[in-house]
């Protein structure tokens, strides 16, 4: 998984139409009560970073849509609390939560289908963070994510696969592949 911000630092004119998105930023989203009753609230295991993607992912699995609304205006300072964009705290938690997000939301067949892309993404991020002196922090975070996923606490919140949601998983998979192509072209 690799979360990215749609339209960041791009002309606003290109984003004037409502459109479906995978998940919304937690600092800029509104959820229906019915969705939260069905999917649950924010997962405390995430604490910070990717908790919004987790909730959006669970909504998608349950068949809900996440929609970008261009008329909504939100002022949100990303990483406002932790300071810099890349610091040990954020890199550690983000990498941990990335692994947990995949484990929690993807059924085994989808994890296997995406494993080559996930491993490549983790490798690219190791190289990226090596240039910033944070590769060790990133790798330790990945290890923490694996341990969290395998713990009783992590397994307790894993989304149970239900056959009725198979079409939703199919749509999610197509979107993941489309987003992969978007990232490659960007």
Model regions: which residues?
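Acidic/His-rich active-site region of diverse nucleotide-sugar glycosyltransferases
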Residues: 1-47, 53, 62
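Nucleotide-sugar-dependent glycosyltransferase catalytic core
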Residues: 75-96, 129-137
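Conserved active-site beta-strand element of glycosyltransferases/polysaccharide synthases
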Residues: 30, 48-50, 56, 65-70, ...
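C-terminal structural cap/anchor segments
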Residues: 105-107
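Non-catalytic, C-terminal membrane-associated alpha-helical segments of glycosyltransferases
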Residues: 111-186
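Short alpha-helical functional segments enriched in proximate histidine and acidic residues
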Residues: 101-102, 145
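Membrane-proximal envelope and lipid/glycan-remodeling enzymes
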Residues: 67, 91-93, 183-186
């Amino acid at each position: 998984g690799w979360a990215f911000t749609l339209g960041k630092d791009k002309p606003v004119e290109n984003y004037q139409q409502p459109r479906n998105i995978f998940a919304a930023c937690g600092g800029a989203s509104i959820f229906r009560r019915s969705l939260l009753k069905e999917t649950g609230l924010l997962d405390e295991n995430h604490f910070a970073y990717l908790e919004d993607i987790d909730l959006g992912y669970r909504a998608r699995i349950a068949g809900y849509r996440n929609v970008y609304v261009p008329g909504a205006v939100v002022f949100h300072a990303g990483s406002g609390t932790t300071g810099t964009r890349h610091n040990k705290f954020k890199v550690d938690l983000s990498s941990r939560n990335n692994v947990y997000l995949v484990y929690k939301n993807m059924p085994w067949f989808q994890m296997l289908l995406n494993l080559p892309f996930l491993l490549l993404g983790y490798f690219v991020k190791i190289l990226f963070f090596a240039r910033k002196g944070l590769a060790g922090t990133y790798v330790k975070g990945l290890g923490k994510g694996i341990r969290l996923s395998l713990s009783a606490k992590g397994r307790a919140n894993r989304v149970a696969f239900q056959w009725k949601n198979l079409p939703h998983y199919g749509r999610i998979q197509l979107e993941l592949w489309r987003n992969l192509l978007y990232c490659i072209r960007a």
